[in-house]
Amino acid sequence: MLVAENARSAGIPVRLIGFDEETAPELIELFPESERRIIKVGQLGKMLKALTVFDSGYALMAGQITPRRLFKGLHPDIKAAQILFSLKRRNAETIFGAIATEIEALGITLLDARSFLDNQLASLGSMTGHSFPVSDEYLFHGIHIARECARLDIGQGCVVRKGTVLAVEAFEGTDEMLRRAGNFKTDESLFVKTVKTQQDYRFDVPCFGLRTLESMKEAGLKCAALESGKVILIDKSTVIEQARSWGISLLGFE
C-alpha cells in the first residue's frame, strides 16, 4: 500500500495485479476495477497478459506470497508449469528470477522493490533509542550466521543467543522461525535480518513490519538487528513507536 500511495504522490499512475486470498482487501479497494486485475497464485500467463493490457513500461514486485503456496494452493497455468518444470531448484530466487525474466521479455523494466520506499528502510544505529543489550561479539556472530544462511539460499534471518544458533529462517518464513526460537524461553536472544551479498533487489527483499514485531513479542525476543538501507520497515514510524512501547530494541547495521 505504501508503494502505491508514494508513487501516486509522485504523480505516477499505478495499476494493481493482486492475488486472490493474498492481497489485502484495503489495497484492492484503492484501485477501480478498470485499474486492477486479481488472479490466483500461479496464473503467470494472466499476469503477463494484464501487464500488456495495462501497457506497462515498469513493474514492481511488492508484498509477500505465503510460502506454503508453493506446495499447497498453487494454481499453475501452462506458463507457470513450464517454468517450474524447468527449474532444478525451487526457491525464492529461482522462481522470482524466472518470473522477472518473463516480465522483462515483454519490454517492461522491473524496478528495485525498494523504489518509493526510501524513508521506510532500516536506519544505521539504534532506531528505538534503547541501548542495545547484546555485545558486539554476539551481534557480529548473529550477522555472520544470517549472511551465511542468505548466501546458501536457506533464508534471510536467524535467532542467536550468546554464540549459539537457536533457529534459522527457511522456507516457512520469519514468523514461524521466531515461534520456534521462542520455544527456548530464554532471554538475551537476538533476531538478525539481512540480505544476500549479491541480492537481486527486484524481488525477495526482506521486510520487517508490525506482524514480525508481534511475533517477536509473542516469542519473548527483545532485540532485532536489521541491515540498514536494505531491510524494508513496513510503516517504519509505527513499527518503531510500537517497538519502544514493548521494550524491543531495533538496531541497523552495515
Regions found by a protein language model. Give the residues of each.
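Feature captures the catalytic cores and cofactor-binding loops of soluble hydro-lyases/lyases
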Residues: 2, 17-56, 73-83, 91, ...
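N-terminal glycine-rich phosphate/adenylate-binding segment common to multiple enzyme folds
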Residues: 44-114
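Conserved mixed alpha/beta catalytic, RNA-binding, or beta-rich assembly cores of soluble enzyme
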Residues: 1, 7-9, 38, 89-93, ...
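Residues at the starts of beta-strands that form the adenosine-phosphate
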Residues: 12-15
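Fold-independent oxyanion-binding glycine-rich loops
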Residues: 18-21, 41, 62-65, 106, ...
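Short secondary-structure transition/capping segments
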Residues: 61-73, 104-112, 156-166, 200-206, ...
